[in-house]
A protein has these predicted regions:
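Structural recognition of the beta-strand scaffold that forms the well-ordered cores
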Residues: 65, 76-79, 120-123, 154-159, ...
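Active-site-adjacent substrate-binding region
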Residues: 3, 167-290
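Extracytoplasmic/secreted proteins, especially bacterial periplasmic and envelope-associated proteins
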Residues: 8-11, 15, 29, 33, ...
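A non-catalytic alpha/beta surface segment that caps or lines the substrate-entry region
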Residues: 8-71, 218-220
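Acidic/histidine-rich catalytic neighborhood of metal-dependent amide-processing enzymes
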Residues: 85-203, 226-229
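Acidic/histidine-rich, surface-exposed loop or edge segments in extracytoplasmic proteins
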Residues: 12-23, 123-124, 183-188, 259-261
Length: 290
């Protein structure tokens, strides 16, 4: 099976972080440049992208969607947001996740995966403030659309900040002291983050990633909207009764560059990012649908 390539992901993040003006909600030309880049890169694999558009504060924004095995009735959604918060490069948040999603799609095609379900790859806009938590988030727009269309969704996997790691002891922070007893103090692992309401789906993805993984995988589940559980696009699928979880490096609990100008490409660990994507690729072959 073909494996993730760190160099390809580096090139993707390099493009995203070098865009000027920065790819926040105010800079429509930069957001459009991201969409065009995605079309060009993914167009090398397959045609047939759908642009889902909506209006927010008088401007038009875009989710870019591609369906793998579109003939399959049962669908898995995999998504990552491509906008940033304010004026900063956004290498980890969320260039790492965009690159990871592109690489996942590349590998699905390169390995010609025959799955019992189809995958909808979704690149979202407007995850960041001032739209976070509103119905103008791109993921809310998408979640509402699949719910209205009564699509058979088995679940949603959100990539959110998957590129910052450290081998320094004590480098991992926690939102509550009690969690120090459950998780490592060294920030060299990846997490699946969900809510107890969808434990069956959560465990399927967690165990599917953990098996044979080169990188340590841990699971965190908390009640709706609490702590790290609802900090990205997965939150909007819960509102429509769709199981969803996040793949995450624990964000600001680990990365001191969160929402800062220092969130640049040189802070990312592309070898470990590759291990995360390889683990997810194997997981996709282990998902059981009934």
């Amino acid at each position: 099976m073909n494996r993730a390539q760190a160099q390809r992901m580096y090139e993707d993040v390099s493009f995203l972080t070098q865009l000027r003006p920065f790819r926040n909600y105010e800079n429509l030309e930069s957001l459009a440049a991201v969409v065009n880049y995605l079309k060009e890169e993914l167009g090398l694999l397959s045609q047939g992208f759908f642009e889902q558009k909506w209006m927010a504060e008088g401007n038009e924004y875009t989710n870019l969607i591609h369906s793998y095995q579109p003939n399959k009735t049962k669908r898995l959604i995999m998504g990552a947001h491509y906008d940033v918060c304010g004026d900063q490069p956004g290498a980890d948040d969320n260039g790492s996740a965009v690159a990871g999603l592109i690489e996942t799609m590349r590998l699905v095609y390169e390995n010609n995966l025959e799955l019992d379900y189809g995958i909808d790859f979704v690149f979202y806009c407007l995850e960041e403030p001032p739209f976070f938590g509103t119905e103008e988030m791109g993921s809310y727009v998408h979640a509402k659309s699949v719910s209205n269309n009564k699509e058979n969704i088995i679940g949603m996997i959100c990539y959110e900040m998957i590129g910052y790691f450290s081998d320094k002891k004590g480098s991992q922070g926690f939102p509550h002291p009690a969690l120090k007893l459950l998780y490592p103090s060294t920030a060299n692992f990846i997490m699946t983050v969900g809510v107890p309401e969808y434990d069956k789906f959560n465990q399927m993805i967690y165990k599917g990633m953990k098996k044979d993984s080169e990188i340590s995988v841990y699971h965190f589940a908390h009640s709706l909207g609490r702590s790290l559980a609802g900090m990205s696009d997965q939150r909007n699928y819960w509102k429509f009764g769709i199981p969803a979880l996040m793949i995450n490096d624990t964000s600001f609990e680990r990365n001191p560059n969160y929402h800062k100008m220092t969130d640049d490409i040189e802070t990312l660990d592309f070898d470990r990012m590759s291990q995360v994507i390889d683990s997810m690729l194997r997981c996709l072959t282990r998902i059981e649908v009934s």
